[in-house]
């Protein structure tokens, strides 16, 4: 997936922008350039996730943190997310590091 995102932001969208400019559509070219920036961010996310998978840190941390179940909202504090949610029985894959971005 990361390679696909790389191709999009390095090759495809810049080429689309160039063509749009050449054909007299500067607003569309501008949009393609902005989409290219989004695709670059997607690549970064995929590569970070791959690194976390390879390092075994998707569901573990060196310090105690809060993990939140994305299904029911249950919050667990520990170095590792539970194998199964104690509240709704969903698997560990439903846990993420709790965000307080509200």
Model regions: which residues?
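Non-heme di-metal
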Residues: 1-102
